[in-house]
Design a protein with these regions (language model features):
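Exposed, low-structure sequence patches enriched in small/polar residues
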Residues: 1-194
């Protein structure tokens, strides 16, 4: 629903019977399976401020809730900054998470810096991750090289951090990390008929 040109509003009520079962369903729910749940979701997006896009949502169900607020700042076409704060209470644990990233492009170079952190209130555990992506497009040769360096400290499973990453063509991966360590990725893409 768009009450005015710069505001978008979405409201959804869901009810899944305890007797309903569909292993291939893909709908809004708090668990990975759609069964025995009812709840409400409301989202708001605001685009009135120059170079800013603000959005928030709340999802409430029988045994928990999730609330998120995020802001995107786009001062120039080649620069983008994003910040997101999320609170999720589920299974008697409350998780606070924060993500900040900045992406920019300079000629043939594309860079992205990202920092993630979370805190589980019930267990008083935390996790963090920082990463740097670098992409280069060669001139006169149809190849793109992408590199990533990531370091993390998420000692508990409840503090795992999900990070999106490039995969093979037309595929998308969202692995998680936990423990203490680093990851280094190198991905090259060659366009045959260019």
């Amino acid at each position: 629903y768009t009450p005015v040109s710069d505001v978008n509003l979405l409201a959804i009520y869901r009810y899944y019977s305890p007797y309903y079962s569909n292993p291939y369903a893909n709908a809004l729910c708090s668990w990975s399976r759609m069964r025995d749940e009812h709840g409400g979701y409301i989202g708001l997006e605001y685009n009135k401020l120059k170079n800013w896009q603000l959005s928030t949502f709340a999802d409430v169900w029988k045994n928990g809730y999730e609330v998120m607020a995020q802001g995107d700042w786009l001062p120039k076409q080649n620069y983008h900054m994003h910040m997101r704060f999320r609170v999720k209470e589920k299974d008697e644990a409350c998780t606070y998470s924060l993500r900040w990233n900045m992406a920019y492009q300079m000629g043939r170079w594309k860079m992205k810096t990202q920092a993630d952190g979370n805190l589980v209130k019930g267990a008083l555990t935390y996790g963090w991750s920082v990463l740097q992506d670098v992409e280069y497009r060669f001139s006169g040769f149809p190849i793109v090289v992408q590199m990533r360096a990531q370091f993390f400290d998420a000692r508990e499973w409840t503090n795992r951090i999900y990070i999106d990453e490039h995969d093979v063509l037309y595929a998308y991966a969202m692995p998680f990390v936990y423990g203490i360590g680093g990851r280094f990725l190198l991905n090259a893409r060659y366009k045959i008929n260019d």
